[in-house]
Swiss-Prot record:
Residues annotated as signal peptide: 1-21
InterPro entries recorded: Snake_toxin-like_sf
Organism of provenance: Micrurus altirostris
Name used for this protein in its record: Three-finger toxin MALT0059C
Any GO CC annotation of this UniProt entry: extracellular region
Main location: secreted
Keyword Protein biosynthesis: no
């Protein structure tokens, strides 16, 4: 009985991942991805120099871009 209980506890921990996974937006239309350990969510602005317009990129990263329109964060779905 103890073995069964221990097995269930281990399976639960593995399946739940103890909350260490970070979920970020990775596209404009709201698709998400689970980031590798140690990474953050980012939304950063990129200038299309030939048009003068800005557009955004969403992704997981270990190094965030700096800038006034950029978001770098470490909670689920924080890079909207």
């Amino acid at each position: 009985m103890r073995t069964l209980l221990l097995t269930l506890v281990v399976v639960t921990i593995v399946c739940l991942d103890l909350g260490n996974s970070l979920i970020c937006y990775v596209t404009r239309d709201g698709k998400t991805a689970t980031c590798p350990p140690g990474q953050k969510c980012e939304k950063y602005a990129v200038s299309a120099s030939h048009t003068g317009h800005w557009f955004h990129r969403w992704h997981c990263t270990s190094t965030c871009h700096e800038g006034p329109y950029n978001v770098c964060c470490s909670t689920d779905f924080c890079n909207r």
